[in-house]
Amino acid sequence: MVKSQRNGKKGAKVLSRKEKRQSEKEEMDSLRQRIEEYNPEVDEASIKHFSDLPITQNTLRGLKECSFVSLTDIQKKSIPVALKGEDLMGTARTGSGKTLAFLIPVIEILLRNDITEYDGLAALIVSPTRELAVQIFEVLAKIGKYNSFSAGLVTGGKDVQYEKERISRMNILVGTPGRISQHLNESVGMETSNLQVLVLDEADRCLDMGFRKQIDNILNHLPRTRQTLLFSATHTDSVQDLARLSLTNPKRIGTSSDQDISAIPESLDQYYVKVPLNEKLDVLWSFIKSHLKSKILVFFSSSKQVQYAYETFRTLQPGIPLMKLYGRHKQTSRLETTVKFSQAQHACLFATDIVARGLDFPAIDWVIQVDCPEDVATYVHRVGRSARFGRQGKSLLMLLPTEEDGMLKRMKVHKIEPKMMNIKEKSKKSIRPQLQSLCFKDPVIKNLGQRAFIAYFRSVYIQKDKDIFKVDELPVEEYAASLGLPGAPKIKIKGGEINKEKKNQSRKLLQLSKADENGELKEDDDKPAKVRTKYDRIFDRKNQTILSEHYLNMTKSAHGGKDDDEDEDFMTVKRQDHELVDDELPDLLLPVSKRQAKKALSRKATLASKGNPTKLKFDDDGVPHAIYELEGEEDFEKAGDAKQQKMEFVQKEQEAMKITDLADREVERQKRQEKKRKRKEIERRIREEEWDDGSGMDGEDLPDLERDMEPTEAKPKRTSNWFDDDDDDNDGGDEKHGNGKPPVKKAKSDSKYVEFEEPETLEDLESLAATLIGN
C-alpha cells in the first residue's frame, strides 16, 4: 500500500513537470504569434500597460514588483519592434525610460531562443560610463530575477582575474567599452559566436572618437547575424558610424515631439546668466548659500576644477553636504558618492561630464553649468539629470560675454531658448579674500588652484567651435586672482601652427641658416634667457656623493667609460658638412640627422640593406658550390635508376633508425633504473629516520614500493662520544663508563682544536665548559 502511494506521488510529479513544460511551450508559441501579427500603426494605440505587451509572465512579475505598470512613449514604440528581431535606433527625452526599452526585449529574445547558462554569452550591453553600467545592471537584476539567466557586470576599477574566472558562465553582460574589449582579447572563456543582441546605450557617445578603438575591437569579435539596438537622447546620422555597426534596415524610433526638437523635458525650467570669468565662483557660492534646502548638481569642464571647488568650498562650510565625482577616482569612491547623493535629500555634487549621461539621480532640483558645454548635445544631457519622469526641475547656465551670442545661436537652431536671469548685486557675495587666505596658508590648495587654472584654459583651447570659445579674449590675470592665486601660472600648450611650421621645414636648410660665412654653426642669440625658478635651482644642484661629476670623472664613467679628456686630444673638429675642393672624393661626412646617426651605429640597420648572406663550400677540385645546392638532372641520372635510388635511400634510413632505436631503448632503460634507484633511496631514508627516532616502523606503515633490489642494511647507530681525537677515529671502539661521568678527553698536547658531538645532559655541558676554559 505504501509502495503504491509513493509510485502515485512520483507519477504526479512527472506529470506536473510535463504539464509545466507543455504550458511554457504553448505560452511561447502564443507570444511568437502575437509578435508576428503586431502592426505598429494599428496596435500601438491599444498598448498602454506592460501587461498588454507580448512578454512572459516572469518578466511581468518582475516589472510589477518594481512598480513599472504604464508604458512611456519610447517604450510603447520600441519594445514591440525590438521583439520582432529588427535593428533599432531609439531617440527620446532624457528620463523617458530608455533603459527598460532595451532590457525587456533583451530578456524576451533570450527566452524565445531557449538560452541557458550553458549557451554562453547571448546579450551584450555597452555603456560609456561605469556609473551608468551599474545602474543598468541593477535594473536588470530587479526585473529579471524570476528568469534563470546569469548576468554579469564588468567595469574598470575591479579585479580582472575575478571576472575572467566567471565570465564564461554569463548570458547577459553589462560593461564599459574598455573592460569588455580587454576581456575579448584576454579571457579564454568569453565566447561570442552565440551572441543574439548587442545594445549600445548612449550610442552617440559610444561611437565617437573617445571609444573608437574599443568599439571597433568589440565589433570585430561579434557575429554579423546579431540584432543591434541603439538608444540615446541625441542620435547620430553619420553613415560611417552606422556602417561600422553593420545595421540591416534599422528602424528609427522617436517620440512625436522628438522628431524636430532636442530631447529637453517639458517640465524643465531653463535659465542662463551672463557672468564674467572672474566672478563665477562668487556667483556659485552665493547660489549655494541661498538654496541650502535643495539638491544641486554642478558641472565643471575638468576634474581639476572639481577638486579645487570641492576643497575650498568644504573649508568655507556653506551649510550643505558637498560631494565630488570625476573620472580619475577609485571605483569604490565613485560608487559611494553615487549612492550617497542618490539617497540625500539636500546635497550639492561637483562633477564633470562623467555623470552627464544616463544616470538617474532622484529629485534633483537644480543643474548648474559653471562652464559652457562643448555643444548643444552635451547641454541636453547635462540638464537631463533634472526633471526626470515628469518631475519639476530647473537648470542654470553660466555664460561669459564672449560665449553668449554663439551659444544662444546654436541652441536656437535646436529650438532651445533658455530665459535670461539677472543677479542682484546685494545677493552676490565675494569669497576672493577667503580663497587668497587659503592659498597662502595651504600649499596644497594653491597647487590645486594652479592646476584648475591651467585645466580650464586647456579645455577652452581644445574646443572645436572657435565662434563660442575664444581663448585669446579671456581675462587671465583677473581669473587667477579670483582663484586666490598671487599670479597667473604659465600655461604650456603643446602643438600649434608654429610647431607645424618647424616640423615641415627642411633640416638642412635650417642648419645652414644658423651657419656663418665660414660655414661654422653659431649660437642662437635671439632666444630669450630662461628664467630660473626656485625649483629649477633645486633640481640643478650638483650631487656631492659618489654620483658627483668629480667622482665619475675619476672612475672614467661619466661618459660611458671612454677616455675623452680634452687635454689629451690633439685633433679637434672645427667644422663639418662643408664643401670639399675635390668633388670626386667619396662622401665621408658625418650623419646630419639623428636617424642617419642611429642607423650608422646600429649593426642591424646597416646589414638590412646588404641582403642575405651566402655560404659556399669547396669540393676536392677547389670548385665553390652553394651549401644548399640542388643536384642537376644529368648528375641524378648518372647515379642510376630512380626506383633503385629510392630503395637504397629507404634501406639506408632504416638501418640508421635501427641504430637510433637501440640508443633510445638504452636511454629509456637507464631512466627506469634511475627512477627505481631514487625510489629505493627514498625508502631507505624513511627507514633510517624512523630508526633514529627509536620508534621503528611496522610493515604496514611502510610505503608500498617495489622491492626488486635487495634493501640496504642501515648502519648501526654510533654511541655518542663527546670528545674525540684523531686517534679515536682509528680505534673505532666505544668506551662505556659505569660511573655516569663523561669520558676523559683524549687529545694530543699540541692539539689546538677540540672535537665533540652534541651534549645531551647537564654533566655533558659542564664537562664541555671546563674543557673550553682550560684551553
Curated annotation (Swiss-Prot):
Its EC number is 3.6.4.13. A motif (DEAD box) lies at residues 201-204. It catalyses: ATP + H2O = ADP + phosphate + H(+). Residues 1-12 have a biased composition (Basic residues). SUPFAM superfamilies: P-loop containing nucleoside triphosphate hydrolases. ATP binds at A92, R93, T94, G95, S96, G97, K98, T99. Residues 21-30, 637-671, 704-716 have a biased composition (Basic and acidic residues). One of its GO terms (biological process) is rRNA processing. It is found in: Nucleus, Nucleolus. Residues 1-30, 633-760 are annotated as: Disordered. It is an enzyme of class 3 (hydrolase). The keyword Nucleus applies. One of its GO terms (cellular component) is nucleolus. Residues 689-703, 723-732 have a biased composition (Acidic residues). Its main location: nucleus. SMART domains: DEXDc, DUF4217, HELICc. GO terms for molecular function: ATP binding; ATP hydrolysis activity; identical protein binding; RNA binding; RNA helicase activity. Residues 267-439 form the Helicase C-terminal domain. Interacts with the U3 and U14 snoRNAs. Associates with pre-ribosomal complexes. The Q motif is unique to and characteristic of the DEAD box family of RNA helicases and controls ATP binding and hydrolysis. This is ATP-dependent RNA helicase DBP4. It comes from Lodderomyces elongisporus (strain ATCC 11503 / CBS 2605 / JCM 1781 / NBRC 1676 / NRRL YB-4239). The lineage of its organism: Eukaryota, Fungi, Dikarya, Ascomycota, Saccharomycotina.
